[in-house]
Each structure stands twice: as C-alpha cells, then as structure tokens.
C-alpha cells in the first residue's frame, strides 16, 4: 500500500523566483495490488507526488508510507534499500545508449550486487515477460519506441518491486503502441500483483487501465474514487473537462442540428442518461416505457468499458409535455440514473 498522510510540499523561493506550493493537504491511500491513476494538468503536482513516493523529495509536512515504511523519514542506506521496492517507468525511456537491452535491464541488479549467473537468469525472465526475448542484444538505437519502453518496464521490475510508478510512460507513443503497453502493464499487475501508480494527463490511459483514480488540480486532490464512479458522476469542473476529452459530450450531428430550446406540439424532449453495467441501457429504456406507460425513443447511445465496468450514455426522446418530463426525470432520479434535459426535437 502507498499512503499519503497530511502531505504538503513547498519549494522555497530561488534566484528571485517565488516559492511554490506544489502539494497541499494530500490524504489518500493506494490499495496494495491495485492500478491507480493520478491525473492532472501540467503544474497540478503530479511530478512532486512521484518524487515523494520514491523518496527523491521530502514532504514539507506529513508522511508517505510505502509497504508500511515511512519513506519520508528514511535516508542513506535505509532509503536506498527501500527504493529497490519501487520501480520507475519514464516517459522518454532513459536507457543507456551504450548498453544492449539485456545490459540495460541488468544495471539495477549489478548495482544491487547480484551474482552474474543470477543476473543473467533474471534478465532472460524479464525479457520474456515483456515480450522482447529476441531483442536481448539490440541497442536502444535499434529498437522502436514501444520496444524501448518494454526494456524500461523490464528494468523497472528487475529488483522485484512491490510498487511500479509509471510517469507519463505512454505519452511519447502512438495510439496502437500505447494500447499494447497498457495491456502489458495490466498483465504484469495480474501476474505479479505489483501495485501500479499511473501518473498521466490523459484520461484515455486511466479509462483503459486503472481501477481507481485520483484527480489533482493546483496541488489539491479535487476528486477520487473508482474509475466508473468518476466517469458517471464527475463533480469537479477539472474532472468534467478531462471526461469531455475522452468520452465527449457531443451528439451525432444529425441529432444535434435538430435540437431546439423550446418544445413544439407533438415533439419530444431530449434527455441524456448515464448508465452502468452490462445491459443497463436496454433495461432503462424498457423499464421506463413499461412503468410509466410512455413511448421512449433511443436517439443515440455510447457504451464504454471503464474500470472493468460497462459505462454508457443514452440519449432518449420522450413526449415533450412538462408533466411527462417531470415524471421521467423523477423516475430516473429514484433509480439513481444521472440525467439532464438537452432540449427538444420536433
């Protein structure tokens, strides 16, 4: 487990530049064996959070607990030993160009004083795990971006860490390679049980891989919880803006062009509903029509798998009278389906 207790981090004024409150009042826990996304814009405090977890920075106040050890209180040899239980994957790979893939993976084991035979066996095991056993003697210049990141992941796992930090590890990769790397991390989490902390500014990464998410803004945790909960009930504007980028609030052009602000005789009210669970969309439409005795039209729908759950957005057309709209919205609220009226169509 990784736990932040009353954390703040302030960088003092330097060479005429004012001090910076990078993190303030941070209290949350990352469950053992979980995949947790930490998301925020540039300057939100993500990098400071990473540096506190791996002990490269000390908090101004509070404690950082990793595997029941107060990392923030350690120094010297004790800190170096604790850091072996924390692996790190970097955005730009940070491989040594003069070393082969195998030798890059071997480096932390050499530093830790492993025997040569044990290093050779461990490196072979890791190359197979990340799917590049045939690239063991290749230099970084001979590898693709995805292959370089696989070497980086193998190196991060070399000392058998319990926590793996992924700092924008897919930001420099194309979409197809990003999906492959995220699939690899999911497999590593399943096989090894390692706790993965995803530091990212991309909600699409959180959607594909994470089960829990923490949203940072201006050094504060503004929202946290299960990914599916955050996707269906975002409360903070910064979270809503992230979700708009990946899920989108846009309607099909053919529908959006027809929506007006005032009802017309015989027209329909357009209501967007958030649903969760396999088959939930069909259930909502059928139950709404049956229990309220209404004609309900499904105008548009989108379903995603998020945090291991199906999360969807339905756009419904219902009779446009105020009375019917009130009944529909009350029914949806009663059964905890978030909903909003978008307007009317003729």
Swiss-Prot record:
One Gene Ontology cellular component annotation held by this UniProt entry: plasma membrane
CDD domains in the record: ABC_MetN_methionine_transporter
Pfam families associated with the record: ABC_tran (PF00005), NIL (PF09383)
EC number(s) recorded for this UniProt protein: 7.4.2.11
Name used for this protein in its record: Methionine import ATP-binding protein MetN
Catalytic function, reaction form: L-methionine(out) + ATP + H2O = L-methionine(in) + ADP + phosphate + H(+); D-methionine(out) + ATP + H2O = D-methionine(in) + ADP + phosphate + H(+)
Biological classification of the source: Bacteria, Pseudomonadati, Pseudomonadota, Alphaproteobacteria, Hyphomicrobiales
Family the UniProt entry places it in: Belongs to the ABC transporter superfamily. Methionine importer (TC 3.A.1.24) family.
Record field: transmembrane: none
UniProt membrane topology term: Peripheral membrane protein
SUPFAM superfamilies: ACT-like, P-loop containing nucleoside triphosphate hydrolases
PANTHER family found in the cross-reference section: AMINO ACID IMPORT ATP-BINDING PROTEIN, METHIONINE IMPORT ATP-BINDING PROTEIN METN
Enzyme category, top tier: translocase
Record localization: Cell inner membrane
Domain ABC transporter, residue spans: 2-243
Subcellular location, principal: membrane
Domain of life from the UniProt record: Bacteria
């Amino acid at each position: 487990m990784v736990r932040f207790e009353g954390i703040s981090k302030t960088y003092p004024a330097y060479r005429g530049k004012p001090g910076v409150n990078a993190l303030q009042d941070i209290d949350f826990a990352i469950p053992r064996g979980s995949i947790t996304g930490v998301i925020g814009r540039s300057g939100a405090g993500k990098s400071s959070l990473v540096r506190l977890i791996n002990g490269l920075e000390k908090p101004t106040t509070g404690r950082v607990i990793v595997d029941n050890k107060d990392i923030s209180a350690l120094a010297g040899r004790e800190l170096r030993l604790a850091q072996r239980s924390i692996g790190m994957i970097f955005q730009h790979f940070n491989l040594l160009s003069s070393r082969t893939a195998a030798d890059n993976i071997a480096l932390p084991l050499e530093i830790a004083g492993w025997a040569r035979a044990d290093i050779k066996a461990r490196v072979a095991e890791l190359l197979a795990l990340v799917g590049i056993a045939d690239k063991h003697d290749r230099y970084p210049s001979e590898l693709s971006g995805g292959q370089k990141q696989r070497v980086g992941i193998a190196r991060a796992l070399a000392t058998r860490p319990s926590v793996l930090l992924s700092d924008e590890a897919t930001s420099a990769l194309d979409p197809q390679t990003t999906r492959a790397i995220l699939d690899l991390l999911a497999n590593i989490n399943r096989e090894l049980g390692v706790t993965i902390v995803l530091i990212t500014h991309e909600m699409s990464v959180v959607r594909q891989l994470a089960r829990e998410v923490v949203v940072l803004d201006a050094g504060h945790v503004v929202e946290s919880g299960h990914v599916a909960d955050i996707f269906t009930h975002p409360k903070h504007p910064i979270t809503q803006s992230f979700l708009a980028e990946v899920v989108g609030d846009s309607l099909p052009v053919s529908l959006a062009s027809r929506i007006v602000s005032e009802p017309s005789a015989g027209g329909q009210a357009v209501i967007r509903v958030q649903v969760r669970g396999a088959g939930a969309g069909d259930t909502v439409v059928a139950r709404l029509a049956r229990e309220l005795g209404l004609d309900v039209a499904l105008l548009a729908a989108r379903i995603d798998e998020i945090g291991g759950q199906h999360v969807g957005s339905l756009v419904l057309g219902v009779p446009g009278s105020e009375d019917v709209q009130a009944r529909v919205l009350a029914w949806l609220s009663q059964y905890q389906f978030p909903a909003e009226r978008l307007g009317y169509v003729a």
